[in-house]
Each structure stands twice: as structure tokens, then as C-alpha cells.
Amino acid sequence: MHQSTLPCDFALPAEWEPQSAIMLTWPHAGTDWKPYLPEITDTYLELADIITRYEQLLVATPDVPATRYQLKKKLSAEQMSRVLLYEVESNDTWVRDHGPLTMVLRRKQNTWMVPYRILDFKFNGWGEKFRWEKDNAITLKLYYQAAFNADIENHQGFVLEGGSIESDGKGTLFTTSQCLLAPHRNQPLDHDSIDHLLQTFFQLKRVVWLDHGNLIGDDTDGHIDTIVRVAPHDTLLYVGCDNPEDEQYEDFQTLEKQLKGLFTWEGYPYRLLKLPMPDPIYDEGDCLTTNPESEGDRLPATYANFLILNKAVIYPTYNQPEKDEEARKQIQLAFPDREIIGVDSQTIIRQHGSIHCITMQLPEGALRDSTFHI
């Protein structure tokens, strides 16, 4: 890690800073959700219901009339007035990774600058594992439809997913070496080269690389938003594993040790809040089970994959009441002034993601049609 010498006119805001909207890319029969499309659509409608209580909702969908019809059956007229629908084709719905990464102008004296800047990185299906070409084009298509109150920078020469980075809004970016150094992303670039590029793109003071904590079943090669999340007042919420019988035990114990050795840019230790590790969940094709004798694939269930709204936090639950409640309490400690709302995410994890993975926040003012305030 080293300090950037670049002028810091712009910053990548922390997720808890004021927002204009949350973006969703809507599920449809052409996505991998097809086998359980009714169930995942219900989950998206539940998310839309919660989000529109607090802020606007931008929806990218290949079928605006059908999606509007679904939303109108669930939402009130007042909530529907906060929904913005844009017609865009998609391969899948993981907007955290194909959506816009929005920088905000911090030095307000630079009045000649557009105060928001979208960085459009290349999304390639997490190293060309899945179809990605349509998803990679979504941000630019929304820009040309005048969805954003922002300039846009083309960074299609560099692969980067939103779920692979966490910003504290003060110049520190967290990421994982397992993901950013994974094959089929940015080779032959090495650690130092990628570190320098991240500092340049996001005008950072430093990048903190985490080297452990890769969830079994994670298709992303270890996204930071599945294991460690940044919260206000130099707080890190992280997934712990205290069960020596869990095959992930050693890896997450080592992650915990690394976190305890980290210091803020100012030289203080971080406040650490441990989230529980959900009991293992296995996909047996026609159903999910927590039976340890299952021969199904283990899914990457995690409580770290929560979404921060203006006055609330939506966090994933997994029909594990004690652990669901323990996670809620820890998240509440990090966000004492926000309502903590659980959403059953058992359908989402069947495609190896959770709530944060299917959502993307837009900072306050970055949306072209931004008239709603709460």
C-alpha cells in the first residue's frame, strides 16, 4: 500500500452516504433464474417494496410493460411514483457487478465540473464463466437513455466488479487478492500494477488487500462483499467461523487475524463486529437442505451481503432463526439509526449470490430524475 499523489477532487462514496436510488436488473426467462422465476420475482418485488419506502428505484428490464405490471400489483401508487423503468437487454441480474460505479465531487469549489462521474469498467462474467456481453453494455445504454446526472468514463480495458471493492468514502478501498488476481480478468497485471490502477481510477490514498475468507460455492473468486463490509466510524463487519468442523474454519480464522492487524489511515485499529457463519446450505436440485450428509453443492450463504439504504439496511436471512437474529443485532450495532430488515434469501443463493449482489446504489444527485426525498 502507498499514498496516491493524485488530486482528490472525486471520491468513491461509502454506501451509507445519501443515495438517490437503488438499481435492480429485473429477472426474466432468459436469465439463469428460469427454473424458479416465480420465486425470484417475488423476492425482487419484496425488495422493490422495501426500497421504495425509502428512496427511488431504477429498474433495467427487457420488458418494461410486463415489469411495470408486476410492480403495480405489489406497490402502492405513491411507491410506483418512485420507480424508473428503462428498457435494456440483460444476460442476468447481478447489477452489483455490471452496474455503474459512481464517483462524487468532494471539492465543491470546482463548480465547472459535473459533480458525478460514472466509471464503466468491463464485466466479463467473473472471468468468462458465464454469458456477459449484454450485461457489460447496460451501464452505457442507461447513460445514453439519460438515466444519470453524470459524466461517464470508459474503462472497458479493465475488468472490475462492484462486489469486489468496498469504499470507506475517505480514500481507503478494500478488496481481495483472490478475486482481483484471478485468471481471465486482468492478466498479466500483477498485484502492484492493479493496486496502482485502482488508486488512479478512484483517487485513493490506499488499497487494503485481504488474502483469506473465500466462501465455498462463490462463483466470483472471493468478492469482498461476501466476507467483509465497511461501516461508519471505522467499523468492519466480517464473517466469522467458530466451528472447527467447518471446512472453511482455518481460512476464516486467518481472515480474522488479518483484520485484527489492520489500522485506519489515521493509525487506529478498526472496530470489528463479527457476523455468524450460516449453517451450511446445500442445493439438491429440487430443494435446499442443511443436512450435513447431503451430496449437493454447498451454497455461499453469508450475512455480509446486506444492502444499505438511506434509513434502513436490508440483510439476507436463511431460515435459521438464531443466526438470522444474531446477524441482525450485529448489523444494528453498526447502523444504530437505521431500521434493519431481513429478507429471505434462500432463492437468491441458489444462483450463488445474495441481496447486495443483485442491487446497486446511486449516490444522491446522480440520478437524472431525482425528485423524491424522505
What residues fall within each predicted segment?
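The feature marks the mature, well-folded catalytic cores of soluble enzymes
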Residues: 1-374
